[in-house]
Regions:
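Alpha-helical scaffold domains
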Residues: 1-131
Length: 131
């Protein structure tokens, strides 16, 4: 059906309305955003219609989420998105390079920087493997 596809979580169908689910990326509670980020990344591999294209900008915005834990979850999940959608890798890497991390406390910034480095490394490997 147009505008729908199945959302799987831990091997079980948990939803079918992609647009409504993706709108939760902007939920006020960070726990909800964390789960949506994780589930969307896990389901990117089944996105044959490239519907992730429509949400990529909103998804990438969470690289600098107001909550550092959500930012870290997003950055780590981007490796899974890039593996499933290799056409996004250059854009993801560019976004990670340009991310302004100055708003995060000194205690969190190094962790986020490490996550970015690990994700970039994984994405670069996926890109080389698919060239």
């Amino acid at each position: 059906m147009m505008g729908e596809f199945i959302i799987y979580y831990r091997g079980k169908v948990v939803g079918g309305i992609y647009d409504g689910f993706a709108s939760l990326l902007n939920h006020p509670k960070s726990l909800v955003r964390n789960r949506v980020i994780y589930i969307l990344a896990a389901n990117a591999q089944w996105d044959d219609e490239n519907r992730f294209d429509a949400i990529l900008n909103d998804y990438l915005a969470h690289v600098i989420d107001e909550k550092p834990i959500t930012a870290r979850q997003c950055i780590k999940a981007l490796a899974q998105v890039g593996k499933a959608k290799t056409q996004y890798i250059p854009r993801i890497i560019d976004y990670l390079h340009s991310a302004d991390l100055s708003k995060y406390k000194d205690s969190m910034r190094p962790l986020i920087e490490q996550d970015i480095a690990e994700t970039e490394k994984a994405l670069t490997l996926y890109e080389k493997a698919n060239s």
